[in-house]
């Protein structure tokens, strides 16, 4: 064998030998606590959902998952922190739907894109939107409400917890799909909106099932429809919105994300552990308290869902002519 070839072969062998210990000694993930950013204050539904999942992940990974609440600015603070974090699996976020698919279109300061800047790991849970009426209002069904808003444009009021929230956009979507024209009334928070519809200050109200179900069961609000594809446990007998308005399936949701570039093995491990957690009876029961339903699936499932939701809500926002403020 020529001398130069022998030298190249020896160099290659030595390089392989030298690299073996480094690969063998690469530390397994995780080796330290994991930070989980939440774009909502402590005690809120997003915070409590994050703590449920964080507790399960911490036990499965044998490392604490530390909840870091960063509310404000439509979720921009939390998501900017995620965007600038190292892509090493030690900083995650669990944003709610509006933070991911609405804020980038309505806040000038939002410089992130949920698909470009972040690695989606798993869908954690979905909360279907619900349409209710004041008990004295003549609309007995969802079809009644739509017909009334068609016959008398801007005379049937429908409330929502805040402007450009998922409930607000869900109600706007009803009008877009049916040519019904509701009078949209946005409040400062859920409590104000619920009080208004119970008192009869507004006719209808839209929100996630969590805040509404107790009042419906107490006979203080009339359920008109739930905007989910199929009937869900605990909501048996409630009409589906898509029976009146085809394709009207609208949810609030929570999605686990990491900085773009996070190693694939870390992403897959997190996805697997989240799916395990969502199959546990105590998680299902605790989620149900918020009207949230676990949604296990693959990373690809979560990415596909996010793509579809971005398209849906960007279309609604564009049709409404809403601009970043």
Question: What is the meaning of each model-derived region?
Answer:
Residues 98-109, 173-177, 204-237:
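A ligand-binding cleft/hinge motif common to bilobed small-molecule-binding domains
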Residues 1-31, 143, 325:
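Short, low-complexity disordered leader/linker segments with a strong preference
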Residues 31-33, 176-180, 217, 223, ...:
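An extracytoplasmic/periplasmic, membrane-proximal ligand-sensing/linker region
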Residues 45-49, 53, 57, 74, ...:
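Stable alpha-helical elements in mature extracytoplasmic
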């Amino acid at each position: 064998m020529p001398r130069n070839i022998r030298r190249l072969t020896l160099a290659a062998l030595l390089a392989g030998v030298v690299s073996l210990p480094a690969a063998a000694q690469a530390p397994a993930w995780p080796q330290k606590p994991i930070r989980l950013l939440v774009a909502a204050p402590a005690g809120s539904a997003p915070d409590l959902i994050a703590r449920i999942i964080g507790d399960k992940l911490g036990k499965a990974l044998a490392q604490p998952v530390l909840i870091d609440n960063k509310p404000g600015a439509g979720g921009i603070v939390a998501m900017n922190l995620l965007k600038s974090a190292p892509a090493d699996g030690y900083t995650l976020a669990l944003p709610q739907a509006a933070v991911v698919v609405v804020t980038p279109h309505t806040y000038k300061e939002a410089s992130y894109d949920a698909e470009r800047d972040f690695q989606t790991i798993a869908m954690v849970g979905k909360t279907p939107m619900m349409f209710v009426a004041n008990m004295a209002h003549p609309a007995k069904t969802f079809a009644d409400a739509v017909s009334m808003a068609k016959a008398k444009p801007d005379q049937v009021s429908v409330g929502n917890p805040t402007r450009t929230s998922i409930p607000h956009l869900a109600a706007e979507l009803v009008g877009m799909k049916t040519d019904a024209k509701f009078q949209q009334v946005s409040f400062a928070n859920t409590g104000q909106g619920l009080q208004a519809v119970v008192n009869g200050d507004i006719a209808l109200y839209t929100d996630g099932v969590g805040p509404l179900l107790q009042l419906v069961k107490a006979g203080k609000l009339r359920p008109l429809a739930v905007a989910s594809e199929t009937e869900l446990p605990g909501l048996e007998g409630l009409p589906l919105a898509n029976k009146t308005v085809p394709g009207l399936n609208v949810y609030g949701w929570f999605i686990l994300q990491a900085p773009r570039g996070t190693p694939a093995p870390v992403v897959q491990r997190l996805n697997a552990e989240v799916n395990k957690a969502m199959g546990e009876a105590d998680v299902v029961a605790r989620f149900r308290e918020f009207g949230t339903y676990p949604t296990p699936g693959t990373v690809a499932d979560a990415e596909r869902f996010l793509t579809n939701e971005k398209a849906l809500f960007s279309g609604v926002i564009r049709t409404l002519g809403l601009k970043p403020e």
